[in-house]
Regions:
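Generic detector of short, locally flexible boundary/turn motifs and exposed helical patches
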Residues: 21-27, 46-51, 56-58, 104-110, ...
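Short, surface-exposed beta-edge/turn micro-motifs
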Residues: 5, 80, 137-139
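Conserved phosphate-coordination/catalytic loops
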Residues: 36-43, 110, 175-180
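Active-site phosphate-binding/coordination module
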Residues: 41-128
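A short local loop/turn or secondary-structure capping micro-motif enriched for an aromatic residue
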Residues: 26-27, 100-101, 183
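Conserved acidic, metal-coordinating active-site core of Asp-based
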Residues: 125-184
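Active-site neighborhood of HAD-like aspartate-dependent phosphohydrolases
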Residues: 2-8, 12-60, 69-70
Length: 184
């Protein structure tokens, strides 16, 4: 960030970008997944983004993986130069990985890798999650058929563990200490 410039960190999903499940008339598709419309900006967001990027350095912060973030097609001239993905563990600069940031994030979670792998194996053996994956080797994510199944998956994890289980609708995330948007 240049001296004197303002950095505006903003959550991405359900703040600037909305899924097809929340699409409203007039929203603009900015993300495709396997050819299907996936993510949308409201018309107000499309109208305001050029003004925002002229005045501040916009830094989207998201739990999305790098691949998911890079699917977003920002309106002409509004693509942010940086983004924090993987819940703040991965910094992108001009679309490329900041290797120093990533190395620091890997060091932060080094002691929790074994536990993250156990969570991944345990969730993969369960019938509920339709998708279970490690995101950038920083945290584990599971998509369940409904919020009750997500709560069950989270509830079965050891409450004394330093790994936090966070439920968001039908999704559950398992974050090691230090992998959070606020710390980033």
């Amino acid at each position: 960030v240049a001296m004197g410039s303002i950095l505006f960190a903003s959550d991405l999903d359900n703040t600037l970008l909305f899924s097809h499940r929340h699409r409203q008339p007039g929203d603009r598709c900015v993300e495709l997944l396997n050819g299907a419309e996936q993510g949308f900006f409201t018309q107000e967001t499309v109208d305001l983004l050029p003004q925002v990027v002229q005045r501040v350095q916009l830094l989207p912060v998201t739990t999305r993986s790098v691949e998911q973030y890079l699917r977003i097609q920002w309106p002409a001239g509004t693509a942010p130069r940086g983004a924090l993905t993987a819940n703040g563990a991965v910094l992108l600069r001009d679309g490329g990985l900041d290797r120093d940031w990533y190395a620091q994030s890997r060091e932060l979670i080094r002691d929790y890798q074994g536990e993250l792998h156990r969570i991944l194996r345990s969730l993969s053996a369960r019938p509920e999650p339709s998708t279970v994956r490690s995101v950038e080797e920083m945290y584990v994510y599971a998509a369940c058929p409904d919020p009750a199944a997500a709560e069950r998956c989270a509830g079965d994890w050891d409450p004394g563990s330093p790994i936090r289980a966070v439920v968001s609708g039908r999704k559950v995330y398992f974050f090691p200490p230090g992998v959070d948007k606020g710390t980033a």
